[in-house]
Amino acid sequence: MNVTFDLTPPSPSQREALIATLNAEERRILLQHGTEAPFCNRLLDNNQLGTYTCRLCGLPLFHSNAKFKSGTGWPSFFEPYTHTHIRKQHDTSHGMIRTEILCARCNSHLGHLFPDGPPPTYERYCLNSVSLTFIPTGTLLPDQLHRGDNTTYRT
């Protein structure tokens, strides 16, 4: 199913309201490009069918059918919901060279992309659980920005 989502960034007032819903750990990771500890995050062992959306703006980012056990301690996916929903950025922090992945709509930090995933893409999108909200199959996707693009689509 081809569904189009509005990728226009939240207005400053919308962004402020969304940020106000975050706890300190979510702010550290989503806004300050932090990383949660491995093997102790809430979505690592989630095996339910559904869609993983951006914790801040609700944009669909990954589907459960692309999730796999990477053994790294973070939820991992071999492809995004759609490539237009993910923004990639060169990251040289902490003495490493990596590809950071961000939400294409709100620019929240999600995690990193590595070239060591399974077929068919051989990519591993390594995500922070706190960057994501899991929406079970059959549930309406959230519409945090009140744009109406998520309200008619069930996961």
From Swiss-Prot:
Its cofactor is Zn(2+). The keyword Metal-binding applies. The active site is at C126. One of its GO terms (molecular function) is zinc ion binding. It holds the Pfam family SelR. One of its GO terms (cellular component) is cytoplasm. Signal peptide: none annotated. Binds 1 zinc ion per subunit. The zinc ion is important for the structural integrity of the protein. It is an enzyme of class 1 (oxidoreductase). Keywords: Metal-binding, Oxidoreductase, Zinc. Gene3D superfamilies: Peptide methionine sulfoxide reductase. Residues 15-137 form the MsrB domain. Zn(2+) binds at C54, C57, C103, C106. One of its GO terms (biological process) is response to oxidative stress. PROSITE patterns: MSRB (PS51790). Belongs to the MsrB Met sulfoxide reductase family. This is Peptide methionine sulfoxide reductase MsrB. The lineage of its organism: Bacteria, Pseudomonadati, Pseudomonadota, Gammaproteobacteria, Lysobacterales.
